């Protein structure tokens, strides 16, 4: 194997793309900041038991584990920043009993890629709100997610909505155990209506519940799905509440194209209620995902309402605006010492100044000029 080879689904980011990513990252954090979201920077590595919450079993398949040479304990390299932010809210920011608005942008590492076209080292960016259970919190985060997609130059975005509360309400009413719920969740994700019908029949569920579960995979489409669901699903207060939340989101974004899928349930995840995602042209999967995950912080000692979204900024490279390198001022190597004060003054003003050693350079072809001493004063002479 060549020494320059990298592992599968791992890649370097070269200067042109690095400028794009850093510019987008700065703009996103600025956007989050003016909406009241404070930046946190959790560590890349933690004790495994802190990263691998019992709530999301699927996270263990993504997490790379190592042994700490200092303590002998098992460490994990984070595969998702959200559990870390939940820990911060629950423990380090526990003095605040009100709302915590937090954001982040940092690398995560996956033991295996999410798909054939995905990288194993995403640059995960996102925003989260803790301590507010009202649907208005979700609407605020969805609005922020859509604004983030504008910065990423995504063009027209489709907003996809779901709600795991509907499935859970039906499961509770039908007295399904955890194993049965997990089985149905997997079948729902596959949109295998025939398999769902066969499974509920095999369990000999009451006709009303069997019909409701068989109906869920068919309840997808535009905003009209909500009125259809109200007329066909069992009259349960939790179901009505979930449909009401979905309606509130639809009303909040009248000009946005919305797709509703009541069988979009995200197997093996920590979400508890409303689910939302953004889709854009030329992407094989959602460009951003979010939802409500009330109680996640309970694993760390403080269960609170929570909602938020995240996305892999690195996956947007093909769509991010090009950021040209700043034209540089060259200074001949033999003049560098004498021109030191002038060089530093230019750099303090934000001007790129490069010492020319006479063997070529990697600066932009468009040079701002060359620093020369004219009439006793160091000046930038245009070419």
From Swiss-Prot:
Gene Ontology, cellular component aspect: cytoplasm
Pathway noted in the entry: Amino-acid biosynthesis; L-histidine biosynthesis; L-histidine from 5-phospho-alpha-D-ribose 1-diphosphate: step 1/9
Main location: cytoplasm
Pfam families for the chain: tRNA-synt_His
GO MF annotation list: histidine-tRNA ligase activity
Protein origin, superkingdom: Bacteria
Location within or outside the cell: Cytoplasm
GO BP terms: histidyl-tRNA aminoacylation; L-histidine biosynthetic process
Keywords attached to this entry: Amino-acid biosynthesis, Cytoplasm, Histidine biosynthesis
InterPro entries associated with the record: aa-tRNA-synth_II/BPL/LPL, HisRS-like_core, HisRS/HisZ, HisZ
Family: Belongs to the class-II aminoacyl-tRNA synthetase family. HisZ subfamily.
Misc: This function is generally fulfilled by the C-terminal part of HisG, which is missing in some bacteria such as this one.
Function text: Required for the first step of histidine biosynthesis. May allow the feedback regulation of ATP phosphoribosyltransferase activity by histidine.
HAMAP family: HisZ
Record's subunit section: Heteromultimer composed of HisG and HisZ subunits.
PANTHER family linked to this entry: HISTIDINE--TRNA LIGASE, MITOCHONDRIAL-RELATED, HISTIDYL-TRNA SYNTHETASE
UniProt-recorded name of the protein: ATP phosphoribosyltransferase regulatory subunit
Annotated source species: Neisseria meningitidis serogroup B (strain ATCC BAA-335 / MC58)
Lineage of origin: Bacteria, Pseudomonadati, Pseudomonadota, Betaproteobacteria, Neisseriales
